[in-house]
């Protein structure tokens, strides 16, 4: 891959093809990009804004190089937020997952350590004494006996270990915040997503339609990636997803 040519195109505000961003992600997992190049890539795309095809390509790359999780469960949901809203709230999506599981619905929660916030889903789960695992038998037992399973992203998405420190060092959220919600290795049939702004809502509508799952997307107009009581909020959904 000609990384210099890729950067020149990004500097000219050109969009990359889905297959190109997939190859970029795979190159990152192979260690073919150094930290400076990865930081430059994250910054360039953040400044221009990511397209639907680019986001799907990065998703393809993460799933292609990651560890799949074929859960032995008919139907389950993931509840997640993009993060990066700078509101410093507690982990609302993670909390909601336990409420949903308590109500009798199966949940496959996918998350990671904090990148742009104080506490990520994995920080919360770990601090409550849960040991992360990639053992499929244990994961299946968790979702079928407890109604919820937690999938720590770094055990399944190899790319995360290459970008984690860089994301933490950058003073702004990157497209990896947008990738997080759509790279659950168990590929849930339904997802409830909180986004920080209406541009993200429109982006994910197109992404989910191409992925082909039932979904609900929520956004508070004052910038929370949750349904908030601090002001009006918007909800969009498709399929059998109910909000």
Positions of predicted regions on the chain:
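Conserved active-site and cofactor/substrate-binding residues in soluble primary-metabolism enzymes
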Residues: 1-2, 15-23, 32-40, 50-57, ...
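Hydrophobic pocket-lining residues that define ligand/cofactor binding sites across diverse proteins
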Residues: 45, 100, 208
């Amino acid at each position: 891959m000609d990384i210099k040519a890729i950067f020149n195109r990004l500097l000219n505000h050109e969009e990359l093809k889905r297959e190109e961003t997939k190859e970029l992600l795979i190159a990152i997992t192979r260690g073919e990009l150094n930290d400076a190049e990865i930081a430059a890539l994250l910054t360039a795309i953040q400044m221009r804004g990511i397209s639907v095809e680019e986001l799907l390509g990065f998703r393809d790359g993460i799933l292609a190089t990651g560890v799949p999780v074929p859960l032995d469960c008919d139907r389950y949901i993931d509840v997640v937020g993009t993060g990066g809203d700078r509101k410093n709230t507690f982990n609302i999506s993670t909390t909601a997952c336990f409420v949903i599981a308590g109500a009798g619905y199966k949940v496959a929660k996918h998350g990671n350590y904090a990148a742009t916030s104080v506490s990520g889903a994995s920080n919360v789960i770990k601090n409550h004494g849960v040991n992360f695992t990639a053992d499929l038998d244990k994961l299946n037992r968790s979702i079928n006996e407890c109604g919820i399973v937690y999938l720590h992203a770094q055990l399944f998405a190899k790319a995360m270990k290459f970008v984690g420190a860089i994301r933490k060092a950058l003073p702004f959220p990157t497209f990896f915040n947008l990738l997080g919600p759509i790279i659950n290795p168990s590929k849930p049939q339904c997802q409830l997503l909180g986004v920080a702004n209406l541009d993200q809502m429109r982006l994910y509508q197109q992404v989910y339609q191409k992925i082909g799952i039932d979904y609900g997307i929520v956004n508070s107009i004052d910038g929370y990636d949750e349904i908030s009581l601090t002001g009006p909020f918007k909800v969009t959904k498709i399929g059998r997803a109910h909000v």
